[in-house]
């Protein structure tokens, strides 16, 4: 292999310059993006950055929220950072990560190189040196005075709003002034002149866990299907009387647009159809609900469903976007057929002869149809006459069954009044179109034998439905019908059939009537007894009139319950049954039940929209309301020590609509806002709405302030916390989120050994005095908490421990390497056993971790009056991602003081050993694939756009042959910050096989390597260009498959 490596700098590639292709890398000025600076933010001419080869970036105008959560695939890009190189060299293993991506470069065959398009110009790489080439982005700092400029503007805006006559603004202004005071107090103690933090990783990781923001209560508002008759601002919910509105056209559920998860699922169904992944997503969503569940066993497998959908979806004719939203397949075929007909009156009887020459081509089409489809559609022949007689008899029978009153019936895929005389030109056309569509679909239909469904009914029914989403949703219901018949409800919660029904009924609440009207199928589905409630958020559309409803609110307050107490009569008999079954070595997945079954009280956090329900009708046919809870009463569950919750009535009269990014945002009660770190401590977090702080465009737009950011600061102020003001708001919000989480978790799990025994109310009130922590990466945060709780002071390799804790083959050994955990595991005392609940945090709070939703119930140790026991907790708790809200509330109560040093009996010791083994061997999944797997540098660009700007780099790792495998790092850019590059590449540069760093910035060279690098000239046919030549000396460039060989050894 060659011992020299050449990098050519030229204006552009010219014809007949093949001599230059000997260079290993070519950097040109073609396609260079213009640099643009505005208000101190260094950026680019962003419209020039769209769809560049090698960069996973589409339109710069796409919102950052859509970029993160909706851009599913990048049409390829070279790896953002090939961590596998570090893993192989440093750890000797291939780690399954989620930060690789597909390539979107181009093979430039004329010169035998691979082309990419970074912002500083087109580049071409020799294939043998390309696999370890990647992009890096540097977000730049800005003056802290610029960062803090929003404070005054925000206060002026709030004061202006408070000047209006509107209830509640006085409290808002008071809270805003407390926030302002805390912000300026922080500023007094901050000495930096420029933004001090830009690390992307903390934001990246908490975005994956959906913790970059705050939560506030959903408003459960009366559905517009009801007219309130006795609802007033002073009347209690239980006193409400409602009138049902007459049902009109079946529409999508009112709650649909307010449910982000359901909305995303619907968008995926429309785009991706009923693939197996979509069917799984439908089941995963519906499995959370139980409005139609029962005890029936479900035998409909996912494979069977997939086969059903594979056949049923062939009946669906999606709208043709390029021909207008109302242009369905039937309309297109009908219009095409009419074009070939002579001019005729469609309301008159169908009569036509071959006579005139103008009719010849029409009859030729009729003859061709007969040859191709074996159906005679000649209007003068017997087939059409027989069809007229059959349809006329059908219409007469339908009208007689309707007390001889006309009604619409489905004929040939369209609706016709029974009072019409059948046999017109229009009727003939509809008949022919129906035959054409049926013939076309039959050619597409997969071979599948339906038990109950009829192909012709399916076809005509689907043709009448409006919208692809409705068609696909009803395909799932039709599959249930064909498999089970009319009885499609009452299956166990979480089963395939139950989950499908739950999802479809949320999308289309009145689907039963539409299935009956369009397909002639009567489904045995009970009318829902609960009152129709729609779930509303800040972004919902509210009526200009008053709307009424309720919300859940929760918090923590000191009361009679003691932290040092055992779980008492709130535990159900199922706890003892579970204990017995585990003693008999029965498998957890086989014996575990819904966590609610282990308690006797009712929290109603699973189905909050059903707390108030219809209790029948009064003599005036008003719907009477009853409730499982009493409005305004504060409940303290015996499950917890200081936790409280209640239902409060709300009215939308005092909602003020504000405009933000061309959308309406309603002002909810700010006192309810909670930062995610605190909101997730409440079991009722599932009744709250997560509001993300992903604001603005994905790049090139600086957001100085926003309503969401203001609300987040108010949420912090509610708990006496303030974020830092010496860095950009994105890094500041990420930092305070991780700081609060660290302080809270450490305080909770250090209580026993510190003998403080504080309840959660006390811990939260102490946040104002807690240390302000900062973590450059999520791994630093994770390990910091781990070592603080376990009182471990060793120097630990971050990457290694996180990798080995994820690996079930190594996790046990790593856990037992911590002295405190090993002591708890060996101890015979109850207090030490309860400390083992920290394993829950160790496992589920790892970076990138996800959990199989079908196995979301996991064990937690509790101290009952009968001894050490285990209950199941829900690691999702009806939320979209893994959440602490389903398990952390249960560790508030410890045990009675007298039991703290009680020795465990043999059965309890066996339970504790089983508990440790469970978490030591629990398999985990990676979260964020594929949607978040290529977003890291995009997030860096977004952060830089909201601070001092961004710089674009390309980094290349060159393998070298020597006694040990080695790497040379080369960084390319327009204005390179060498110190930043060295920091970013420290994992490579600190390795013993590193040969150092070479930086190429335009025509400038910085050599910090062990090799000789010369800046030479290369002459080629009238052009003199620069050539950077790296001489290998005793080293040899190449071994082009070195990385593949390394990985092969590591696997």
Swiss-Prot record:
Q: Which Pfam families match?
A: Orbi_VP2
Report the InterPro entries cross-referenced here. Answer: Capsid_VP2_Orbivir
| Any one GO molecular function term | structural molecule activity
Give its localization.
Answer: Virion
Which UniProt keywords are present, listed alphabetically? Capsid protein, Inner capsid protein, Virion
Instruction: Report which superkingdom the organism of origin falls in.
Output: Viruses
A GO cellular component entry from the record: viral inner capsid
The family annotation for this protein states: Belongs to the orbivirus VP2 family.
Purpose: The VP2 protein is one of the two proteins (with VP5) which constitute the virus particle outer capsid. It is the major target of the host immunogenic response.
Q: Would you tell me the protein name for this molecule? A: Outer capsid protein VP2
Q: Which organism is it from?
A: African horse sickness virus
């Amino acid at each position: 292999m060659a011992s020299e490596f050449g990098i050519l700098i030229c204006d552009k590639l010219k014809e007949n310059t093949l001599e230059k292709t000997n260079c290993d890398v070519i950097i040109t000025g073609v396609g260079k993006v213009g640099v643009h600076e505005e208000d101190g933010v260094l950026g680019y001419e962003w419209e020039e950055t769209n769809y560049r080869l090698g960069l996973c970036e589409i339109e710069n105008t796409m919102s950052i929220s859509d970029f993160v959560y909706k851009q599913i695939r990048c049409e390829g890009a070279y790896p953002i950072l090939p961590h596998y190189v570090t893993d192989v060299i440093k750890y000797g293993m291939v780690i399954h990560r989620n930060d690789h991506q597909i390539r979107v470069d181009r093979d430039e065959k004329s010169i035998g190189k691979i082309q990419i398009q970074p912002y500083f110009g087109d580049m071409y790489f020799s294939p043998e040196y390309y696999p370890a080439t990647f992009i890096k982005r540097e977000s730049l700092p800005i003056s802290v005075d610029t960062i803090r400029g929003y404070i005054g503007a925000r206060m002026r805006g709030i004061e202006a709003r408070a000047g209006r006559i509107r209830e509640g603004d006085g409290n808002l202004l008071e809270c805003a002034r407390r926030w302002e005071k805390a912000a300026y107090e922080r500023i007094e103690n901050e000495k930096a002149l420029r933004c001090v933090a830009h690390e992307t990783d903390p934001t990246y990781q908490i975005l994956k866990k959906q913790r970059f923001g705050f939560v506030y209560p959903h408003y459960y508002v009366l559905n517009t299907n009801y007219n309130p008759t006795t609802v007033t601002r002073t009347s209690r919910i239980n006193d409400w009387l409602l009138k049902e509105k007459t049902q009109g056209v079946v529409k999508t559920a009112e709650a649909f647009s307010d449910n982000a998860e359901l909305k995303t699922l619907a968008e995926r169904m429309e785009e991706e159809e009923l693939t197996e992944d979509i069917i799984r997503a439908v089941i995963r969503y519906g499995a959370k609900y139980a409005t139609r569940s029962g005890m029936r066993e479900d035998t409909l497998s996912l494979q069977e469903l997939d086969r059903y959908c594979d056949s049923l979806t062939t009946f669906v004719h999606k709208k043709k976007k390029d021909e207008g939203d109302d242009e369905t397949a039937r309309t297109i075929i009908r219009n095409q057929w009419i074009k070939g007909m002579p001019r005729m009156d469609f309301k008159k009887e169908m009569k036509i002869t071959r006579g005139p020459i103008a009719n010849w081509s029409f009859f030729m089409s009729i003859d061709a149809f007969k040859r191709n489809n074996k159906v005679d559609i000649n209007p003068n022949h017997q087939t059409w006459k027989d069809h007229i007689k059959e349809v006329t008899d059908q219409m007469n029978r339908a009208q007689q069954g309707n007390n001889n009153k006309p009604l619409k019936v489905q004929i040939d895929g369209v609706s016709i009044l029974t009072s019409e005389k059948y046999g017109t030109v229009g009727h003939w056309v509809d008949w022919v179109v129906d035959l054409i569509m049926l013939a076309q679909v039959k050619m597409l239909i997969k071979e599948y034998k339906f038990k109950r469904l009829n192909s012709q009914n399916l076809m005509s029914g689907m043709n009448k439905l409006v919208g692809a989403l409705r068609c696909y949703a009803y395909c799932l219901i039709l599959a249930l019908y064909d498999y089970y018949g009319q009885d499609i409800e009452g299956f166990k919660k979480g089963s395939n059939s139950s989950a499908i029904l739950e999802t479809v009924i949320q999308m289309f609440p009145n689907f039963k009537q539409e299935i009956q009207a369009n397909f002639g199928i009567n489904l045995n589905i009970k009318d829902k007894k609960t009152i129709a409630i729609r779930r509303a958020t800040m972004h919902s559309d509210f009526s200009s009139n008053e709307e009424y409803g309720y919300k859940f609110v929760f918090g923590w307050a000191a009361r009679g319950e003691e932290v040092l107490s055992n779980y008492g009569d709130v535990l159900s008999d199922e706890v003892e049954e579970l204990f017995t079954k585990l003693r008999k070595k029965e498998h957890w997945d086989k014996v575990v039940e819904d966590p609610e079954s282990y308690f006797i009280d009712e929290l109603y956090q699973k189905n909050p929209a059903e707390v108030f329900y219809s209790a029948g009708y009064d003599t005036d046919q008003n719907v009477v309301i009853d409730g499982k809870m009493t409005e305004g009463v504060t409940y303290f569950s015996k499950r917890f020590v200081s936790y409280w919750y209640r239902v409060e009535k709300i009215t939308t009269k005092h909602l003020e609509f504000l405009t933000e990014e061309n959308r309406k945002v309603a002002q909810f009660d700010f006192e309810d806002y909670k930062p995610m770190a605190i909101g997730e401590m409440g079991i009722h977090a599932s009744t709250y709405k997560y509001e993300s702080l992903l604001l603005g465009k994905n790049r090139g737009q600086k957001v100085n302030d926003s309503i969401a950011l203001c609300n987040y600061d108010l949420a912090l102020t509610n708990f006496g916390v303030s974020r830092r003001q010496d860095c950009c708001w994105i890094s500041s919000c990420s930092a305070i989120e991780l700081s609060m989480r660290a302080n809270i978790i450490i305080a909770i799990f250090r209580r026993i050994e510190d003998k403080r025994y504080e309840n959660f109310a006390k811990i939260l009130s102490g946040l104002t005095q807690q240390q302000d922590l900062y973590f450059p990466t999520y791994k630093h945060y994770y390990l910091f908490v781990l070592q603080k709780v376990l009182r471990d002071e060793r120097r630990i390799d971050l990457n290694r421990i996180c990798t080995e804790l994820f690996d079930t083959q190594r996790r046990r050994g790593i856990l037992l390497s911590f002295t405190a955990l090993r002591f708890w595991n060996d101890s015979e005392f109850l207090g030490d056993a309860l400390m083992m609940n920290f394993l829950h945090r160790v496992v589920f709070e790892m970076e990138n971790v996800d959990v199989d939703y079908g196995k979301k119930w996991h064990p937690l140790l509790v101290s009952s009056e009968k001894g050490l026991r285990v209950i199941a907790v829900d690691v999702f708790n009806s939320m979209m991602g893994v959440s602490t809200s389903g398990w952390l509330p249960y560790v508030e109560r410890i045990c009675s003081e007298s039991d703290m040093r009680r020795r465990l009996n043999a059965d309890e010791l066996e339970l504790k050993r089983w508990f440790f083994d469970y978490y030591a061997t629990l398999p985990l999944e990676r979260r964020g694939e594929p949607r978040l797997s290529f977003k890291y540098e995009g997030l860096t660009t977004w952060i830089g756009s909201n601070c001092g700007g961004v710089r674009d780099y390309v980094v290349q790792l060159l393998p070298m042959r020597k006694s040990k495998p080695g790497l040379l790092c080369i960084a390319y850019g327009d204005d390179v910050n060498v110190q930043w590059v060295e920091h970013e590449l420290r994992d490579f540069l600190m390795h013993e096989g590193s040969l150092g760093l070479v930086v190429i910035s335009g025509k400038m060279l910085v050599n910090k390597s062990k090799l000789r690098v010369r800046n030479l000239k290369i002459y080629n046919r009238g052009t003199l260009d620069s050539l950077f030549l790296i001489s290998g000396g005793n080293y040899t460039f190449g071994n082009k498959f070195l990385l593949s060989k390394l990985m092969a050894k590591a696997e």
